[in-house]
Amino acid sequence: MENAGGAEGTESGAAACAATDGPTRRAGADSGYAGFWRPWVDAGGKKEEETPNHAAEAMPDGPGMTAASGKLYQFRHPVRLFWPKSKCYDYLYQEAEALLKNFPIQATISFYEDSDSEDEIEDLTCEN
């Protein structure tokens, strides 16, 4: 019986050690990725407070603008860039490269239906 109690004590000791070891490992693993950019963490290492996006922040005189350059210095993530479907293949590589040079953030490009799509114009001319 002492062996069973001793083994049980050893198992609970191992479980306590594993429970203590889990968070320590996780903290150590996170510190290894300190060089990666994370949009939700500012340069000082603090997490951004989650606040809802407001239309005023997107306006040129909103609080997210700098007075000197007029460029945004802080973005609310996830950022979506809207791109017309008519240009999704023709000019995507050249224009997207120029766009990313001027807008160097992590973003998702979302395509939208535009009214002056070349496909629609071709369909209209073929029907006549």
Swiss-Prot record:
The answer on whether this UniProt entry bears the keyword Zinc-finger reads no
InterPro entries, alphabetically?
Ripply_fam (IPR028127)
Gene behind the chain: RIPPLY2
What this protein is called in its record is Protein ripply2
Q: What does this protein do?
A: Plays a role in somitogenesis. Required for somite segregation and establishment of rostrocaudal polarity in somites.
Q: Which organism is it from?
A: Homo sapiens
> Which Gene Ontology cellular component terms are annotated?
nucleus
Q: Where does the protein end up?
A: Nucleus
What's in the keyword line of the UniProt record?
A: Developmental protein, Dwarfism, Nucleus
Pinpoint motif WRPW motif by residue range.
Answer: 37-40
Residue segments, region Ripply homology domain: 77-112
Q: Which domain of life is it from?
A: Eukaryota
Q: Name one GO biological process term.
A: determination of left/right symmetry
- Asked if the Swiss-Prot or TrEMBL record annotates the protein with the keyword Transmembrane helix, the reply is no
Linked disorder? Spondylocostal dysostosis 6, autosomal recessive: A form of spondylocostal dysostosis, a condition of variable severity associated with vertebral and rib segmentation defects. The main skeletal malformations include fusion of vertebrae, hemivertebrae, fusion of certain ribs, and other rib malformations. Deformity of the chest and spine (severe scoliosis, kyphoscoliosis and lordosis) is a natural consequence of the malformation and leads to a dwarf-like appearance.
The entry sums up its family as follows: Belongs to the ripply family.
Q: What remark about domains does the record contain? A: The ripply homology domain is required for transcriptional repression.
**Bias category Low complexity: which stretches?**
9-22
**Predominant place of localization:** nucleus
Q: Where is this region: Disordered?
A: 1-63
